[in-house]
């Protein structure tokens, strides 16, 4: 029997595209949902029957009672954060598994993150302050602590104290105090007690699901392509690989294991934090998009910067990820605009370009305007959309060279058009 392929959901803007709703909507078709990278800086908001769920580490498939949910080795895991998140749900044993190879994001990582951002002043990247960068830095520097070490909290405590002693001068500069050893040990024992039942070799779990059990597996990325450490708007990026290729390293699978790739995009664009954003609208339309779309970060609560759909960035991200189709989210937020705009090219040094240069700071958007429409909210069939909205979708398909296969017309799970 040939191995089954794993399908992949990937954000192809600056994160916050609505991946959570799509994973939740599709999860009933899958036996396993896997998260491959990032940490509790990422946030999914899912509405089911009027109830809001905020997820940061747990895969969105958790709302499907029959799905197994996996947090892979590429994730940096905050024990405190995931334990709080788990309180939203019951009977998680056997439904949630955490890689023993995932790295720990501990409280001092957040302190380092916040201290460094403060030192940068007006040159700060605008991180969430959740310690993601420092946790990944420890991983790359080969001094990180892994989730599997929680199974022996006494030994882990010794390692953390040793780490502080070896980096005493650095911590002193950042005004971070060494933890009390006894208090630290009790804290780690608490984490160990609550998380030990969920810690396992998740790579073997996924291999078995694909190779032997013929399970349907869905892979879930965090953040978005434009925040990728290599291919995003560096240095205003996250610390992990957010593209489809990153799912392989973050879960321990190979490229041949990937089947269908679905790219998630909003019908407009948003960004949290600093960094270039070519199609940002600083006027009344941008403000209106933010108000209608309730554009506040799930993790930070910060207002998101808003602008028009950037087809240049979308085409780039779709090609980079190998997207088979797009899921177009929040189409209803554009309801009522007299006209809507699409960024179809950039101007750089007086010349028109249709690609992303390494630095987006100096590009200016070139727009095409299209007639707006009255209402798409709640539509569940393509035929129910106004002609202008249908034309808008076709324009996006044409410019991005990727078909739109899913359309979301409200936050509710069922207000989704599958083409």
From Swiss-Prot:
Positions that bind GTP: 15-21, 43-45, 304, 330-332, 408-410
Record: residues binding substrate: 298-304
Chief subcellular location: cytoplasm
Catalytic activity, EC: 6.3.4.4
Enzymatic reactions: IMP + L-aspartate + GTP = N(6)-(1,2-dicarboxyethyl)-AMP + GDP + phosphate + 2 H(+)
Cofactor: Mg(2+)
Residues annotated to bind Mg(2+): 16, 43
Residues annotated to bind IMP: 16-19, 41-44, 128, 142, 223, 238, 302
Purpose of the protein: Plays an important role in the de novo pathway of purine nucleotide biosynthesis. Catalyzes the first committed step in the biosynthesis of AMP from IMP.
Family matches, as PANTHER family: ADENYLOSUCCINATE SYNTHETASE
NCBIfam families the UniProt entry points to: PRK01117.1, purA
Protein name: Adenylosuccinate synthetase
UniProt lineage: Bacteria, Pseudomonadati, Campylobacterota, Epsilonproteobacteria, Campylobacterales
